[in-house]
């Protein structure tokens, strides 16, 4: 028979008592009252913060947006099909944040910064809040460096600077996304990180943009944030802020970034859907009262940082879609008043074969020539003036048959200048090529050519100057000025190419 030793038993009990560790955690919980349409009403969650993340029993995450006296309105960041009435919800104590790192370059992610391109996880050691405060007045400096888009019409007459916010506005199918993607392609070798945010787009359109960027080697310096049309409204609403957080990460590390929001009309619609389902009072066009704040707090995050903060920059190109050219609708007027200028794309010009279909008359950049190199300023002033005069004359000439020679010449010059602004998609031009093209047009070298020959001649001229007069490009890129020497080289090249072209 086994003898029971009391001292052994007391030792074991003592050890167990010493090892016992009583941990008490306080969790803020609640109960689901109602769920549907991407919204859940929760009873409880007494100490939840506005914008705090909450976790449902089956793993779905939501954001507490409405804090009412007897319940909390939560928007779901998932379909929420498994959430049941009466199930428990716990507050996480966190505000929405995403991991950030260099490893995101070249990847396609969703609004929660999870990869959706099937190329595995992305490792990141740091994280940033999705909603961060914008830099203050002291943290900024005025915009002074150009951000070249590669499109002559924009870089010469509506210049964009690093740290500027320039709205791209127009009807559907007028080439808004094409202007934005061409700008991304033109940043190759410019040391600019690009972020393209697709909000509520068709998955096929996003795939097309990604393929186009991959084929031209632009994905190396680009991050694509995509929430397609079938995504929950909460994720479509968050996507632009996720893109801004990623761009900010690079901006505060003394780098230049470009962010494109395609498009903010769809984000406003997603936010309107969420607000109406949360029973917030509707305002103009049924948008909630704070839809201006929705966009202003996003676009104010674009900045040119001061020298103390490393002179990084974030340039924003928000896109807004208009309905049959109505620029005075609610969202377009809001975003126009927040941004530093707008590029207006016209369906009529697009259908008339003028592409990019930029209406130069009502497009404007409020930064202006501060964001241009000296060489471009030297040639662009004359171009702007001549095109404005041409637009007036053209309207007048429709009513008059017998025009004097000077007017006919001015009309002919204007038509050739308009031809010179046309560009194929995905064919951005360097600033040297643009200066040379504008100089050729404004100094009358194209006047002797048929309108149909202008683009062919300009393509040949660019090739000719690149191979036979490389010093022109060297002078412009080193001095940023159209020096008398560069001008004489250019004149010589144009004359030689004109003679060759007319002999063909």
Swiss-Prot record:
<dbReference type="Pfam" id="PF00006">
    <property type="entry name" value="ATP-synt_ab"/>
</dbReference>
<dbReference type="GO" id="GO:0045259">
    <property type="term" value="C:proton-transporting ATP synthase complex"/>
</dbReference>
<feature type="binding site">
    <location>
        <begin position="170"/>
        <end position="177"/>
    </location>
    <ligand>
        <name>ATP</name>
    </ligand>
</feature>
<keyword id="KW-0597">Phosphoprotein</keyword>
<dbReference type="InterPro" id="IPR027417">
    <property type="entry name" value="P-loop_NTPase"/>
</dbReference>
<dbReference type="InterPro" id="IPR020003">
    <property type="entry name" value="ATPase_a/bsu_AS"/>
</dbReference>
<dbReference type="GO" id="GO:0009535">
    <property type="term" value="C:chloroplast thylakoid membrane"/>
</dbReference>
<dbReference type="Pfam" id="PF00306">
    <property type="entry name" value="ATP-synt_ab_C"/>
</dbReference>
<dbReference type="GO" id="GO:0046933">
    <property type="term" value="F:proton-transporting ATP synthase activity, rotational mechanism"/>
</dbReference>
<keyword id="KW-0547">Nucleotide-binding</keyword>
<keyword id="KW-0375">Hydrogen ion transport</keyword>
<dbReference type="Pfam" id="PF02874">
    <property type="entry name" value="ATP-synt_ab_N"/>
</dbReference>
<comment type="function">
    <text>Produces ATP from ADP in the presence of a proton gradient across the membrane. The alpha chain is a regulatory subunit.</text>
</comment>
<dbReference type="InterPro" id="IPR038376">
    <property type="entry name" value="ATP_synth_asu_C_sf"/>
</dbReference>
<keyword id="KW-0934">Plastid</keyword>
<keyword id="KW-0472">Membrane</keyword>
<dbReference type="GO" id="GO:0043531">
    <property type="term" value="F:ADP binding"/>
</dbReference>
<keyword id="KW-1278">Translocase</keyword>
<dbReference type="GO" id="GO:0005524">
    <property type="term" value="F:ATP binding"/>
</dbReference>
<dbReference type="InterPro" id="IPR023366">
    <property type="entry name" value="ATP_synth_asu-like_sf"/>
</dbReference>
<keyword id="KW-0150">Chloroplast</keyword>
<dbReference type="InterPro" id="IPR000194">
    <property type="entry name" value="ATPase_F1/V1/A1_a/bsu_nucl-bd"/>
</dbReference>
<feature type="site" description="Required for activity">
    <location>
        <position position="363"/>
    </location>
</feature>
<dbReference type="InterPro" id="IPR033732">
    <property type="entry name" value="ATP_synth_F1_a_nt-bd_dom"/>
</dbReference>
<dbReference type="InterPro" id="IPR004100">
    <property type="entry name" value="ATPase_F1/V1/A1_a/bsu_N"/>
</dbReference>
<keyword id="KW-0793">Thylakoid</keyword>
<feature type="modified residue" description="Phosphothreonine">
    <location>
        <position position="257"/>
    </location>
</feature>
<keyword id="KW-0406">Ion transport</keyword>
<dbReference type="InterPro" id="IPR005294">
    <property type="entry name" value="ATP_synth_F1_asu"/>
</dbReference>
<keyword id="KW-0066">ATP synthesis</keyword>
<dbReference type="InterPro" id="IPR036121">
    <property type="entry name" value="ATPase_F1/V1/A1_a/bsu_N_sf"/>
</dbReference>
<keyword id="KW-0813">Transport</keyword>
<comment type="subunit">
    <text>F-type ATPases have 2 components, CF(1) - the catalytic core - and CF(0) - the membrane proton channel. CF(1) has five subunits: alpha(3), beta(3), gamma(1), delta(1), epsilon(1). CF(0) has four main subunits: a, b, b' and c.</text>
</comment>
<dbReference type="InterPro" id="IPR000793">
    <property type="entry name" value="ATP_synth_asu_C"/>
</dbReference>
<keyword id="KW-0139">CF(1)</keyword>
<protein>
    <recommendedName>
        <fullName>ATP synthase subunit alpha, chloroplastic</fullName>
        <ecNumber>7.1.2.2</ecNumber>
    </recommendedName>
</protein>
<comment type="similarity">
    <text>Belongs to the ATPase alpha/beta chains family.</text>
</comment>
<keyword id="KW-0067">ATP-binding</keyword>
